[in-house]
A protein has these predicted regions:
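Extracytoplasmic electron-transfer domains, predominantly the class I c-type cytochrome c fold
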Residues: 28-32, 91-138
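Sequence/structural segment immediately N-terminal to covalent heme-attachment motifs in c-type
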Residues: 45, 57-80, 101-109
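Short cysteine/histidine-rich zinc-coordinating motifs and their immediately flanking basic loops
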Residues: 85-90
């Protein structure tokens, strides 16, 4: 009798634990980003991060990018880009043009494997200015 009660309690705790992980993932709907102060980049995507140092807009882009990252990316990629294992650790992203190329491809096209969406197409919702600001922050 006691074993059945203990088993049920463990099962209930396991279900609650898994439920908590599911709900902890949070809302992944992209949130608006205020890019006031950054120059307009136009509709055509740039190949290279326009805010990379020594750009005069670098510091503002980092500030905007930090806020935008925390609103839109941290749920999966972790605070300060330190992944908890759900998504790639963005600290390992190359800071050069090569990293820009990968980043641009990923934010425009997202990541879909076998029909499962691992990352939404962020460029459908966020502006190029906002996304390059996030890249600058990273």
């Amino acid at each position: 009798m006691n074993n059945k009660i203990i088993l049920r309690a463990l099962l209930a705790a396991g279900v609650l634990g898994v439920s908590g992980l599911v709900f902890a993932h949070g809302d992944v709907t992209p949130q608006a980003v205020n890019t006031k102060g950054l120059p307009a980049l136009g509709e055509e995507w740039l190949d290279e991060n326009p805010y990379r140092a020594p750009s005069e807009h670098h510091d503002l882009a980092v500030q905007i990018g930090s806020s935008a990252y925390n609103q839109n990316c941290a749920r999966c990629h972790g605070l300060e880009a330190i992944s908890g294992g759900i998504a790639p650790d963005l600290r390992e992203l190359e800071a050069s043009y090569d990293g820009d190329e990968w980043y641009k491809e990923r934010v425009i096209n997202g990541a879909v494997r076998d029909g499962a969406v691992y990352m939404p197409r962020m460029a459908d919702t966020l502006s190029q200015e906002a996304l390059w600001a996030i890249r600058t922050y990273i």
